Amino acid sequence: MNVIILAAGQGKRLTTLTKNKPKCMVNLFGKTLLEWQISVFKKCGISDITIVTGYRHELIDFNGLTFFQNKNFETTNMVESLFCASEKLNKSTIVCYGDIIFEGKVLNCLIQSKSDFSIVVDKQWKKYWEMRFDDPLTDAESLKIDNDGNIISIGQKVQKINEIEGQYIGLMKFQNSGIEKLKQFYEKTKNQSKNKPNPLNPHVSFNQSYMTDFLQGLINEGCKLEAVQIKNGWLELDSIDDYNKYTELFSKKTISEFIDLDV
């Protein structure tokens, strides 16, 4: 099993924290985000780690890891970053956003999933979103799960809280026939977008497709995406407000309401 960390972005919403370094290299609770991630991957037995870099790529330097560069990071999104490392999509592969940290038990839940497509979903998202946002609906996106535990809707803007049965966290796994289906679907939709609107999302170019657009496209193709359900145990660092709130919770020793940093 290997892992691909998507860490090409600058993270402009972190303002001065990312003026001279990439988002994944921001220090949180004494370690950079990448250091938190690499540590938990290794604790869970995964040492084959690839990082897709972009903004200030020269600052991301870890011994024993594999690196690919998304040279077009300013005009592309997560899907294109992933396929910069397409040669690593050759066995069971975990894909992880570069702006999250998570407990080992969250990762182990994903590792243990036997599905071709496994997507980590936080079922206890509401408390976390209420801590981060005055109105959780301004940022939260749709996620619906069928009776078999598979995701049937993901990544859409919502009007009502009952349209959200969990939140996608940016951590997933592809394996077995899922790897080949993933690559085939990418090539198919990329070719379709050359002379017509982007089939994943007509509002953006194919290169700017969101990962949730891509996952919804797989669902629409008939692929079964298992929702690996968790209850907290992770953080996303998306804005300076996030950083300030997490730092305050850490100083008050109440960050454990959302994540156990010792696990």
Could you say what each language-model-derived stretch is?
Residues N2-I5, K31-V95, S205:
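Conserved N-terminal catalytic core of the sugar/cofactor nucleotidyltransferase
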Residues M1-V3, I161-V263:
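Conserved alpha/beta core of the MobA/IspD/sugar-nucleotide pyrophosphorylase nucleotidyltransferase superfamily
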Residues G104-F185, T189:
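Conserved core of the sugar-phosphate nucleotidyltransferase
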Residues G9, D99, S239:
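Active-site glycine-centered loops adjacent to acidic/histidine catalytic or metal-binding residues
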Residues C24, D48, T66, N150, ...:
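Conserved beta-strand segments of alpha/beta enzyme cores
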Residues M1-T18:
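N-terminal nucleotide-binding beta1-loop-alpha1 segment
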Residues N20-E35:
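Short catalytic helix/loop segments, enriched in acidic residues and glycine
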Residues I60-A140:
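Conserved beta-loop-beta/alpha segment of the NTase-like Rossmann-fold superfamily
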